[in-house]
C-alpha cells in the first residue's frame, strides 16, 4: 500500500514538473517565421553561420567534432595547414 502511494505521488510530481518546465508554444510559430524571413534576406544574420563556441587546433575536444572550428576531432582539435 505504501509503495503504491509513493508511486502515485512520484508520477504526479513528475507530470507536474513536465508541465511547469515546458516551453510556452502558443506563439512559437508566430515569432519563428519573421526571424527566418530576416535571415533569408540577410544570410550573414543567420546564427548557423557563426562559430562562437568553437575551439582552435590543439584543444581537447573528446569525441565531439562540433566543438572544433575545423570540424576534425580525434581527442584534440586538428587543424590542417595548406
From Swiss-Prot:
This is Delta-conotoxin SVIE. Delta-conotoxins bind to site 6 of voltage-gated sodium channels (Nav) and inhibit the inactivation process. Impairs rapid channel inactivation of Nav1.4/SCN4A (Kd=500 nM). Interacts with a conserved hydrophobic triad (YFV) in the domain-4 voltage sensor of sodium channels. In vivo, injection of both native or synthetic peptide induces twitching of back limbs, running in circles, and spastic paralysis. The presence of a 'disulfide through disulfide knot' structurally defines this protein as a knottin. The cysteine framework is VI/VII (C-C-CC-C-C). Disulfide bonds join 54-69, 61-73, 68-77. Keywords: Cleavage on pair of basic residues, Disulfide bond, Hydroxylation, Ion channel impairing toxin, Knottin, Neurotoxin, Presynaptic neurotoxin, Secreted, Signal, Toxin, Voltage-gated sodium channel impairing toxin. It comes from Conus striatus (Striated cone). Its main location: secreted. Residues 1-22 form the signal peptide. Expressed by the venom duct.
Amino acid at each position: 500500500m505504501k509503495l503504491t502511494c509513493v508511486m502515485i505521488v512520484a508520477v504526479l510530481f513528475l507530470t507536474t514538473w513536465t508541465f511547469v518546465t515546458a516551453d510556452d508554444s502558443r506563439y512559437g510559430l508566430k515569432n519563428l517565421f519573421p526571424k527566418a524571413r530576416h535571415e533569408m534576406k540577410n544570410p550573414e544574420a543567420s546564427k548557423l553561420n557563426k562559430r562562437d563556441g568553437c575551439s582552435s587546433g590543439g584543444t581537447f575536444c573528446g569525441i565531439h567534432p562540433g566543438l572544433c572550428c575545423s570540424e576534425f576531432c580525434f581527442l584534440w582539435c586538428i587543424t590542417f595547414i595548406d
